[in-house]
């Protein structure tokens, strides 16, 4: 069963202010901007314009549109597992062991592997 809810806050375009918030549904406590505190040795701000968020398996996937990145973290702890750089990434979906992303960078000639986390 779920014990909480992640909220990806978009932030203002051009300000590098996207944040990840968390609502603990067992206590009702809402925590703002948890990503830097969960990743003290690595993380700064999440990036510019949080656009999409999904939990798939044990991972939390966050699309940071204007930063051209998909950030991947542990769904249980929000600790960063890595990221994949994708120009103008917008949305993501999953099927089996693959994540599919949309991008408005231009035409695509076929599927390609952009990264692995």
Language-model region placement:
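An edge-strand/N-cap motif at the start of beta-rich repeat modules
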Residues: 1-28
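A short beta-strand motif characteristic of beta-propeller blades
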Residues: 29-45, 76-84
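Structural recognition of the beta-propeller blade-terminating site
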Residues: 24, 72-74
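Short, intrinsically disordered low-complexity segments
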Residues: 38-68
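Repeated scaffold domains used in trafficking and secretory/extracellular systems
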Residues: 43-52, 86-97
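A charged, solvent-exposed segment within the mature domains of Sec-exported extracytoplasmic proteins
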Residues: 88-117
């Amino acid at each position: 069963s779920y014990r909480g809810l992640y909220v990806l806050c978009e932030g203002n375009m051009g300000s590098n202010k996207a944040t990840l918030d968390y609502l603990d549904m067992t206590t009702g406590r809402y925590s703002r901007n948890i990503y830097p505190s969960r990743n003290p040795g690595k993380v700064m701000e999440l990036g510019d314009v949080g656009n999409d968020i999904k939990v798939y398996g044990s991972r939390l996937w966050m699309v940071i549109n204007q930063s051209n990145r998909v950030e991947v973290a542990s769904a249980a702890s929000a600790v960063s597992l890595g990221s994949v750089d994708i120009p103008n990434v917008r949305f993501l979906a999953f099927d089996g062991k693959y994540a599919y992303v949309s991008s408005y960078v231009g035409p695509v000639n076929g599927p390609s592997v952009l990264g692995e986390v």
